[in-house]
UniProtKB/Swiss-Prot annotation:
This is tRNA N6-adenosine threonylcarbamoyltransferase. Its EC number is 2.3.1.234. GO terms for cellular component: cytoplasm. Keywords: Acyltransferase, Cytoplasm, Iron, Metal-binding, Transferase, tRNA processing. Pfam families: TsaD. One of its GO terms (molecular function) is iron ion binding. PANTHER family: TRNA N6-ADENOSINE THREONYLCARBAMOYLTRANSFERASE (PTHR11735), TRNA N6-ADENOSINE THREONYLCARBAMOYLTRANSFERASE, MITOCHONDRIAL (PTHR11735:SF6). GO terms for biological process: tRNA threonylcarbamoyladenosine modification. Coiled coil: none annotated. It comes from Nocardioides sp. (strain ATCC BAA-499 / JS614). Fe cation binds at residues 114, 118, 311. Binds 1 Fe(2+) ion per subunit.
Length: 348
C-alpha cells in the first residue's frame, strides 16, 4: 500500500462527532459536529445525550468530510476509529459506523487509542514526530505525561492525574464563576483581564514529600476545592467576586504545575522535544509558559493549532495513516469499544 495512504478517521469518544480524511501527513478534511450546546444546560456532558447526537450526526459528517476532501468513500485505503478510552455508549456509535464502512467498502479497519491519536495529529501540522518525544496531554478527561518512542506501538505513561483532570477542573471552576460550559475557553478569555497573583492557589503534588511518590503525577481536586472555598467566603462577606482575577490565578496554578512537571519529565528522560495536545492545549497561557520554560532548558515545543487540539476525526485518521504506512496489522472486525483502554494499547 502507498506510503501516503488515504485514510478516513472517526472520533466519538465524548461529545464531538469527528470525521477526518488524510493522505499521509496531509490533512484533506476535518469535519466536526459538536453537541456541546445540548450539554451546556446540564453543566457537563451527559453520556446518553452524546450517544444520540453521534447517531444523528454520523452520516452527515461523513458526507461533509468526503465532499471537502473531494473524494468518494470507496477511494479510501483504510478506516480508523477511536476504540477508547472515552464514554462507552459514544464509542460504540463510532466503532459501529467504522465497522459498517470497513465491511461495505472491503477496507481494513484500525481501532486506535484516543490519547495516541492526540499525539499523532501534530504530524499534520509539523511533519514526522521526533522519536522519542514527551507528550503532555491535557483535556476534560485526561492529564497525562507520555514517553513516545513510536506513536503506533511504543507509548509509555510517565505520569497521570490521580483525581480530576485539568479540563474537568476548568469546567468546575468556570461554573463557580458563573461562566458558560465548556469552561476552558471562557476562563482563558476572562483571565486576560485579571492578575495571576491575586490569589495564591495551591499547586497539587509539588511538595517535597509528594514529589517522592508522585513526581510526574497531577492532582487538581485540591485546587478546585480551594477555589470553591475562596469564592464561597467572598460571597458570604457580601463582596463581589473578581472573576477575572480568580480566573487568572486559577489558570496560572494549573499551567504552572503542568509545564513544570512536563519540563522536568523531559529533562529527566533526556528528551529534547515536548509535544502538547488535548483540548486544554488550546489555552493561551499554557502555550506561552511552556515555550518560556522549555526554551530555558533547551527543549523544543510542538503544539498543534487549537482546532487540532480538541477532539476531531483528523487525529484518528492521522494515527490510522501512520499504522498503514508502518505496516501494522489491521484490527479484527470484532474489535471492541473499550471505555478504559490503557494508553499502552495503541492499536486494538
Amino acid at each position: 500500500m502507498s506510503s501516503e495512504p488515504l485514510v478516513l478517521g472517526i472520533e466519538t469518544s465524548c461529545d464531538e462527532t469527528g470525521v477526518g480524511i488524510v493522505r499521509g501527513h496531509t490533512l484533506l478534511a476535518d469535519a466536526v459536529a459538536s453537541s456541546v450546546d445540548e450539554h451546556a444546560r446540564f453543566g457537563g456532558v451527559v453520556p446518553e445525550v452524546a450517544s444520540r447526537a453521534h447517531l444523528e450526526a454520523m452520516v452527515p459528517t461523513i458526507e461533509r468530510a468526503c465532499e471537502t476532501a473531494g473524494i468518494r468513500l470507496y477511494d479510501v485505503d483504510a478506516i480508523a476509529v477511536t476504540s477508547g478510552p472515552g464514554l462507552a455508549g459514544a464509542l460504540m456509535v463510532g466503532v459501529a459506523a467504522a465497522k459498517a464502512l470497513a465491511v461495505g467498502l472491503g477496507k481494513p479497519i484500525y481501532g486506535v487509542n484516543h490519547l495516541a491519536a492526540h499525539v499523532a495529529v501534530d504530524q499534520l501540522e509539523h511533519g514526522p514526530l521526533p522519536e522519542p518525544c514527551l507528550a503532555l496531554l491535557v483535556s476534560g478527561g485526561h492529564s497525562s505525561l507520555l514517553r513516545v518512542e513510536d506513536v503506533t506501538s511504543g507509548v509509555d505513561p510517565m505520569g497521570a492525574t490521580i483525581d480530576d483532570a485539568a479540563g474537568e477542573a476548568f469546567d468546575k471552576v468556570a461554573r463557580l464563576l458563573g461562566l458558560p460550559f465548556p469552561g476552558g475557553p471562557y476562563i482563558d478569555r476572562a483571565a486576560r483581564e485579571g492578575s495571576t497573583v491575586y490569589v495564591d492557589f495551591p499547586r497539587g503534588l509539588t511538595s517535597r514529600r509528594d514529589l517522592e511518590r508522585h513526581r510526574f503525577d497531577f492532582s487538581f481536586s485540591g485546587l478546585k476545592t480551594a477555589v470553591a472555598r475562596w469564592v464561597e467566603a467572598r460571597e458570604r462577606s457580601g463582596e463581589p467576586v473578581p472573576v477575572a482575577d480568580v480566573a487568572a490565578s486559577f489558570q496560572e496554578a494549573v499551567c504552572d504545575v503542568l509545564t513544570r512537571k512536563a519540563i522536568d519529565a523531559a529533562s529527566s528522560a533526556g528528551i529534547e522535544d515536548l509535544l502538547i495536545g488535548g483540548g486544554v492545549a488550546a489555552n493561551s497561557r499554557l502555550r506561552v509558559l511552556a515555550e518560556e520554560r522549555a526554551a530555558a532548558r533547551g527543549i523544543r515545543v510542538r503544539v498543534p493549532r487549537p482546532g487540532l487540539c480538541t477532539d476531531n476525526g483528523a487525529m484518528v485518521a492521522a494515527l490510522g495513516a501512520e499504522m498503514v504506512a508502518r505496516g501494522r496489522t489491521p484490527s479484527p472486525l470484532d474489535l471492541p469499544a473499550d471505555s478504559s483502554l490503557p494508553v499502552t494499547e495503541v492499536l486494538v
